[in-house]
């Protein structure tokens, strides 16, 4: 099964009215996850998966998608600063292709440039220790990515009125 990739504007028509969204910050060593509320207004950091191998990572992701009745998966697309696509984008797309063979949920890519940097800056401003930052930065970056999509959905709804 090929990955079904949607645009943000397509989500309201394709996702149930109270289905949550899961945000994903895919890294080489970890996968940060975030969850929306059922009204799709607020993103909350959920957990960080320590990457072991794809099959184990996918099992946990699918468990959470089913547990929280997620309607779609929002995955950060790590574009280069100039907007070009490098090796990390290709790795992300390969991950989505592999995951789509196991899950029937649609995916939305969201530009994640500087998301981890923004979260790290915010944590430093809050005087969070380096050790604690390392524990939470990935799931907070996933929440940052997901919140971007939720905010965009709100703008789309406002424009439709």
Curated annotation (Swiss-Prot):
GO MF annotation terms: nuclease activity
InterPro entries tied to this protein: RNaseH-like_sf (IPR012337), YqgF (IPR005227), YqgF/RNaseH-like_dom (IPR006641), YqgF/RNaseH-like_dom_sf (IPR037027)
Subcellular localization: Cytoplasm
Keywords: Cytoplasm, Hydrolase, Nuclease, Ribosome biogenesis
Protein name: Putative pre-16S rRNA nuclease
Function: Could be a nuclease involved in processing of the 5'-end of pre-16S rRNA.
Chief location: cytoplasm
Taxonomic lineage: Bacteria, Pseudomonadati, Pseudomonadota, Alphaproteobacteria, Hyphomicrobiales
A Gene Ontology BP annotation from the UniProt entry: rRNA 5'-end processing
Database matches in CDD domains: YqgF (cd16964)
